[in-house]
């Protein structure tokens, strides 16, 4: 029982080491890897090589698949190029299996020792994250060594020998058992290594080992499908395409397993080595053969998994990819893109408010809907950022994290103000049949145009962080405040002149001027985050 526990813990250590390498590489090179994948989709050979290269770095075809899946889910990459990258990822993980199964036992303690020094010494820096990668690689090599050590006494047990002796060559049964190995161990690499060790010990025959390897590859596809079962239709299509490619490859090669085993058995290599080499060449040949069929497979997957119909018209988060949370740069970019969507909705609210001011009361209902949409997006962004490992963020990432939270909150508060403004105009002006004076309406229009311009500039500053634009936004904020004050005095002058329309709408008019001032402050606050200096007049602003 203790020996079995050692084996399970070694497999768990292998999975954990792979996770550490993936998160470390993604935190250092995540944005670059994402760029490489997104730019490689134009040509199939380039996309295939990108899948191999990225998987070699992150030590996991599942990680590469998750990246590509997020692209497809956000409509950044078409399904066919995504499937090409996934095929490349399958080859990449097989090649890394060959490299990691060389005798590198001397390298494991060295990587762990150096990695710990760098990671603990400079945890938040690039060097610290590279140290994290070193620790992960060291743990992977250590886990592989422990698996071999743990399997040896297990294979000598009579009960185990009887169980594996039942694998007498039923190719479908053997392949299913291999798939179960991969799913249970959460790693096709662990399943392949276990198969190689059992073969070297003479517990299973070479043909059975080949079936187990084929099944392990199929199991990794099933694992990806299970991981994406709750994802949207676009993401599930990628996982389905990958699984179908592996299933087709398995069905093609399984009838020839005994012939392959007989041919490979003539090579003067240890059986365990042959199992690993078969794993590499099987994936390489399968993926190269499948490359010409990615377009038909993409069409087939779209037929099987159709887009879900929109059951409601409420705006939903689109860019908050949960798989990117371990990579701060990517997660922050996703949250920023979602904040830009709030900005777009805010712009629609401003346009709707202007229509209400000009006598279209039906737009007030649309304002309420947009305010609800913005609240949904803001809540999603807030919860998404709360799930990030904030204590591991670098200083620049922490600053950006705070900027996104502040900007999304300001826009959410602004939406509440605009919704209230629309309701008050509809109730106090339109329903009561009290129109603004011509001069008053012109002034409100001028402030509206300036406010809308400031909103657009603010979103640009938020996204780009451009200092010149931030200074321009700050100056524009001051000009708006001066203009607002001037129009407030002009309204009072009209009251002195006994303008009937101004008198009837006075409280509403002055209230709108105050609300617009608050909106302007909320929109323009992003300028100070970029400039990182307080404004001398900031204390006089209304928020």
Swiss-Prot record:
> What is an annotated GO biological process for this record, any one?
sodium-dependent phosphate transport
What cystine pairs are annotated? none
**Single GO term (MF):** phosphate transmembrane transporter activity
Alphabetical GO CC annotations of the entry are:
plasma membrane
Q: Where found?
A: Cell inner membrane
Report which reactions are catalysed by this protein: phosphate(in) = phosphate(out)
InterPro entries hit by this protein: Na/Pi_transpt, NaPi_cotrn-rel/YqeW-like, PhoU-like_sf
Q: Looking at the Swiss-Prot or TrEMBL record, what is one Pfam family this protein matches?
A: Na_Pi_cotrans
Q: Which UniProt keywords apply?
A: Cell inner membrane, Cell membrane, Membrane, Phosphate transport, Transmembrane, Transmembrane helix, Transport
Q: Isomerase: present as a keyword of the record?
A: no
Where do the TM regions start and end? 1-21, 48-68, 76-96, 99-119, 134-154, 175-195, 196-216, 240-260, 274-294
Please verify whether the record's keywords include Transmembrane helix. yes
Q: How does it sit in the membrane?
A: Multi-pass membrane protein
Q: Which family does it belong to?
A: Belongs to the YjbB family.
What does the protein in this record do?
Might be involved in phosphate export. Overproduction of YjbB reduces the elevated levels of polyphosphate (polyP) in a phoU mutant that accumulates 1000-fold higher levels of polyP than the wild type, suggesting that YjbB exports excess intracellular phosphate (Pi) in the phoU mutant and thus reduces the levels of polyP.
PANTHER family xrefs = PHOU DOMAIN-CONTAINING PROTEIN, SOLUTE CARRIER FAMILY 34 SODIUM PHOSPHATE , MEMBER 2-RELATED
Q: What is this protein called?
A: Putative inorganic phosphate export protein YjbB
Origin organism is Escherichia coli (strain K12)
Q: What gene is behind this protein?
A: yjbB
């Amino acid at each position: 029982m203790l020996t079995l526990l050692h084996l399970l813990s070694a497999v768990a250590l292998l999975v954990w080491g792979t996770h550490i390498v993936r998160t470390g590489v993604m935190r250092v090179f995540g944005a670059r890897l994402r760029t490489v994948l997104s730019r490689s989709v134009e040509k199939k050979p380039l996309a295939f090589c990108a899948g191999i290269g990225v998987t070699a770095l992150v030590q996991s075809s599942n990680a590469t698949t998750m990246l590509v899946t997020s692209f497809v889910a956000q409509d950044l990459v078409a399904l066919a190029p995504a499937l090409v990258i996934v095929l490349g990822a399958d080859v990449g993980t097989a090649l890394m299996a060959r490299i990691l199964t060389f005798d590198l036992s001397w390298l494991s303690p060295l990587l762990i020792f150096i990695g710990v020094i760098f990671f603990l010494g400079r945890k938040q820096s690039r060097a610290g994250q590279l140290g994290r990668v070193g620790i992960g690689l060291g743990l992977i090599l250590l886990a592989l060594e422990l698996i071999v050590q743990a399997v040896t006494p297990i294979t000598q047990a009579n009960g185990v020998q009887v169980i594996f002796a039942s694998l007498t060559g039923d190719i479908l049964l053997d392949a299913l058992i291999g798939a179960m190995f991969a799913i249970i161990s959460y790693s096709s690499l662990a399943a392949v290594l276990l198969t190689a060790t059992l073969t070297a010990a003479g517990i299973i025959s070479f043909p059975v080992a080949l079936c187990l390897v084929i099944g392990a590859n199929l199991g990794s596809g099933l694992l990806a499908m299970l991981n994406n079962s709750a994802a949207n239709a676009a993401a599930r299509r990628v996982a389905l395409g990958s699984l179908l490619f592996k299933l087709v490859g398995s069905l093609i090669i399984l009838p020839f397993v005994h012939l392959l085993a007989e041919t490979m058995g003539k090579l003067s290599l240890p059986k365990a080595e042959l199992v690993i080499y078969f794993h590499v060449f099987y994936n390489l040949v399968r993926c190269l053969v499948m490359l010409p069929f990615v377009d038909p497979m993409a069409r087939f997957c779209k037929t099987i998994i159709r887009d879900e119909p929109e059951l409601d018209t409420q705006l939903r988060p689109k860019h908050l990819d949960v798989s990117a949370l371990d990579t701060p740069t990517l997660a922050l970019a996703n949250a920023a893109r979602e904040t830009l969507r709030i900005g777009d909705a805010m712009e629609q609210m401003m346009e709707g408010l202007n229509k209400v001011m000009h006598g279209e009361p039906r737009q007030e209902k649309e304002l309420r809907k947009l305010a609800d949409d913005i609240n949904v997006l803001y809540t999603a962004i807030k919860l998404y950022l709360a799930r990030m490992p904030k204590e591991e963020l670098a200083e620049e990432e922490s600053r950006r994290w705070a900027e996104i939270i502040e900007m999304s909150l300001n826009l959410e508060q602004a939406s509440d103000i605009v919704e209230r403004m629309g309701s008050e105009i509809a109730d106090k002006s339109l329903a009561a049949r009290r129109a603004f004076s011509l001069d008053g309406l012109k002034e409100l229009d001028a402030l509206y145009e300036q406010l809308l311009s400031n909103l657009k500039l603010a979103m640009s500053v938020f996204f780009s962080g451009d200092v010149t634009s931030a200074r321009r936004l700050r100056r524009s904020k001051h000009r708006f405040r001066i203009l607002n004050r001037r129009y407030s005095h002009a309204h009072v002058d009209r009251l002195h002149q006994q303008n009937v329309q101004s008198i009837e709408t006075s409280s509403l008019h002055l209230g709108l001027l105050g609300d617009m001032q608050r909106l302007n402050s909320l929109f323009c606050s992003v300028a100070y985050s970029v400039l990182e200096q307080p404004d001398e007049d900031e204390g006089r602003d209304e928020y």
